[in-house]
From Swiss-Prot:
Stretches the record annotates as Disordered: 1-63, 81-100
Low complexity bias spans: 31-63, 81-92
Reactions the enzyme catalyzes: holo-[cytochrome c] = apo-[cytochrome c] + heme b
Keywords, alphabetical: Heme, Iron, Lyase, Membrane, Metal-binding, Mitochondrion, Mitochondrion inner membrane
Keyword Cytoplasm appears in the UniProt entry: no
Protein known as: Putative holocytochrome-c1 synthase
GO cellular component: mitochondrial inner membrane
Length: 287
């Protein structure tokens, strides 16, 4: 979930000014490795593409189960190559070179505010090389993700990027889909003078040391703590709306070996009258 923009090097003094949690990538890498570990114990399967879809009710506190704004991600991961692979390929000696990292950057479906100005602390807390001509945020490539983690003192494996980057992209897309559901009742179409819909203005990863009030209360009640938190600022036709997103690692069942479940709890912050109003109207079914 870290950084949509490019992540090239920057002076340490400037980087220290940004309120970014450098452990965020490591958190997601840990989740990815856990899924890969589970997949190695399962029967070999053909590679599957990343899928993002709502699943059954989560095994979280009752307040989560009844939350219409919460959703699951069930992401299948690549298992080892099928045992029926060509024998001549299996006989080839292992390559000594490290896996090549893809430099392709995927354009997200998330529009960004056009007035985001460059600064020592960019709105996405990464060093940017500019927005896509489409006006949407751009996801980092495998190489950018890998180099950013290594530069910040972690020990990433190039092979992990094949898993981490799809997780990063899929979870961002799901979070944005949830925000669009929240925003739908308040957005006017362009034909009626609207601005065309909300845009993502900025975001930041706060990690687990800054738990949201809901997450803290449920953790005190004995429920699972989130493994990450992000705050997103949405531009709704000139009005800034803040959202909080808690990320939970879902419990996998016996039939989903090699798959990693994510539970996203997305809602407006209660730090403004607009946030209170949106959550109250949703609670009584009026939005």
């Amino acid at each position: 979930m870290r950084g949509f923009g490019s992540d090239s090097s920057q002076a340490s003094g400037e980087e220290a000014k940004c309120p970014v949690n450098h452990k965020t990538r490591e958190l997601w890498l840990h989740q990815a490795r856990a899924a890969q570990s589970a997949s190695t114990s399962a029967a070999p399967a053909l590679p599957q593409s990343v899928q993002v879809a709502p699943a059954s009710q989560p095994s979280q506190p009752s307040s989560y189960s009844s939350s219409s704004w919460s959703s699951w991600l069930r992401i299948p991961f690549f298992s080892q190559q099928s045992q029926s692979a060509n024998s001549t390929q299996q006989a080839q000696p292992p390559k000594l070179s490290a896996p090549l990292l893809d430099e392709t950057r995927v354009i997200s479906s998330i529009p960004r505010t056009p007035d985001a100005t460059p600064s020592a602390c960019p709105v996405n807390h990464e060093v940017e090389t500019g927005a896509s001509p489409t006006g949407h945020w751009v996801y980092p490539s495998e190489k950018q993700f890998f180099e950013a983690m290594r530069r910040k003192g972690y020990d990433p494996h190039a092979a992990d990027m094949k898993t981490v980057v799809p997780i990063h992209n899929a979870v961002n897309e799901r979070a944005w889909a949830e925000i669009l559901q929240w925003e739908a009742p308040y957005v006017e179409p362009v034909s009626k003078g609207g601005c065309g819909g909300p845009r993502l203005h900025s975001f930041s990863g706060l990690g687990t040391q800054h738990m949201s009030p809901r997450a803290r209360i449920n953790t005190l009640l004995g429920y699972q703590a989130p493994f990450d938190r992000h705050d997103w600022v949405i531009d709704r036709c000139g009005k800034k709306i803040e959202y909080v997103i808690d990320f939970y690692a879902g419990r996998s069942d016996g039939g989903n070996a090699g798959k990693l479940n994510f539970y996203l709890d997305v809602r407006p912050k209660l730090n403004s009258w607009e946030g209170f109003k949106m959550r109250a109207l949703r609670a009584v079914g009026l939005s």
